[in-house]
Amino acid sequence: MNKKIILAIESSCDETAAAVVVNGREVLSNIISSQIDIHTKFGGVVPEVASRKHIEAINAVVEEALEVAGVTFDDIDAIAVTYGPGLVGALLVGLQYAKGLAYSLDKPLIGVNHIEGHISANFIDHKDLEPPFVCLVVSGGHTFVVHVEDYGKFEIIGETRDDAAGEAFDKVARAVGLGYPGGPKIDKLAKEGNSDAIKFPKANFHDDNLDFSFSGVKSAVLNYLNKMEMKNEEINKADVVASFQKAVVEVLTDNAIKTCKMRKADKIAIAGGVASNSALRENLLREGEKRGIKVLFPSPILCTDNAAMIGSAAYFELLKGNISKMSLNAKPNLRLGER
């Protein structure tokens, strides 16, 4: 098989990233310029600030990706870029840069769905992973459980009806005074708490409906905190976040396991920033082992937004001849499976 070397660019939120990926599974470089320190003081991502920082960083990030990979533009077979979903201003920075490169170098342009990229991160760390399998996508903006039928072909089994899991983590973290980003801080503090101390609600729909809802548990936490403050009672933050985390993790795990049973799948892959959560990993591994289901995780660097996952997804699009036109535009509300 001829090697296909792809230069990939990701700028959908607050990471400016570029990577060089070979045949969808071998990463020669994966450079990420994070804005997390900038947005922390605002308590969350400020879209306009994110866009400006992408503009400042993108050229240097791409140059570093090429240098670390030991390749030049002449070695690149295609340019890949995230075009949605995400913050429209942030997306446009990466997209316009990639289009400029593709045009000037006369290379194919491949637009990639950001969520599909998260799923494809598993192909990098698990070289023998092939469809079909179930994937649980859990991030700050998205929560899906999908059946991956083939490369680039997905059946959405369940999705969030309101807050994404990562969004709920951020809001609860802010409420208890942990700040941003909430996911890692809750994960760390929860280890010191009793996850059975407080019974927070879990949204369970009918057996054949595997959608998610996290607004209820988020509101329950906020109500609990308000009541404790009104009574002037001491709040054990570790117990609060541990109990909240348990409620979220159990719903995520239950729906992933049920999807495996529904589609007769024996593999679950996890994707997205919340895939780094230690409680989620432990619970899924434990429940999967009970049922003979193999549970796969990307390495932490591939759970967060990165360009290597975009390069992986782009490779399989390239094999199918899915080349984007120069008229490709940013789609902030792009859904999984849409083009």
Curated annotation (Swiss-Prot):
GO cellular component terms given for this protein: cytoplasm
Protein name: tRNA N6-adenosine threonylcarbamoyltransferase
Coiled-coil blocks: none
NCBIfam families, A to Z: gcp_kae1, T6A_TsaD_YgjD
Catalytic EC class: transferase
GO molecular function: iron ion binding; N(6)-L-threonylcarbamoyladenine synthase activity
Cofactor(s) listed: Fe(2+)
